[in-house]
């Protein structure tokens, strides 16, 4: 077993580094973007990677804008949402949607937060992560 200690890891090509097993088969990638934000009132980003802004599109509906565009629109997005306080609601998250301009999805994505009864809601804690090229 070896341990690698480095300040930076860089692909020899133009893409992100990939993780491979001893046979050379790819077994993983790094996230292309992630965000943790407050979805109440005017959305505010707590922390993020490759996310420049969150836009409120109505109750429980948000647009996530990437700092650097993704290579294509074939990415996967996952997330969760929660409410602070005594109620402790944990909600069904994530309807990833799209707008009418398919090419915009390389620079933005859309998400919704809904309850188990399909009502759109704003929540204090909303988190999303994006994997793909």
Feature roles, as predicted:
Residues 69-82:
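Short, surface-exposed, low-complexity cationic segments
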Residues 2-72, 116-133:
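Extracellular receptor-binding modules and their adjoining Ser/Thr/Gly/Asp/Asn-rich linkers
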Residues 85-133:
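Extracellular jelly-roll beta-sandwich "head" domains, especially the C-terminal globular C1q domain
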Residues 8, 80-82, 97:
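Intrinsic disorder/low-complexity segments
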């Amino acid at each position: 077993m070896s341990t690698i200690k480095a300040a930076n890891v860089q692909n020899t090509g133009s893409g992100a580094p990939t993780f491979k097993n001893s046979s050379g088969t790819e077994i993983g990638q790094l996230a292309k973007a992630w965000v943790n934000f407050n979805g109440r009132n005017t959305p505010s980003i707590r922390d993020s990677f490759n996310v420049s802004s969150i836009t409120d599109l109505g109750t429980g509906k948000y647009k996530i804008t990437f700092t650097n565009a993704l290579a294509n629109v074939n990415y996967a997005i996952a997330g969760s949402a929660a409410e602070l306080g005594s109620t402790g609601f944990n909600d069904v998250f994530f309807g990833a949607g799209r707008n009418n301009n398919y090419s915009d999805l390389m620079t933005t994505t859309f998400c919704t937060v809904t309850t188990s009864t399909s009502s759109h809601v704003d929540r204090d804690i909303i988190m999303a992560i994006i994997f793909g090229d």
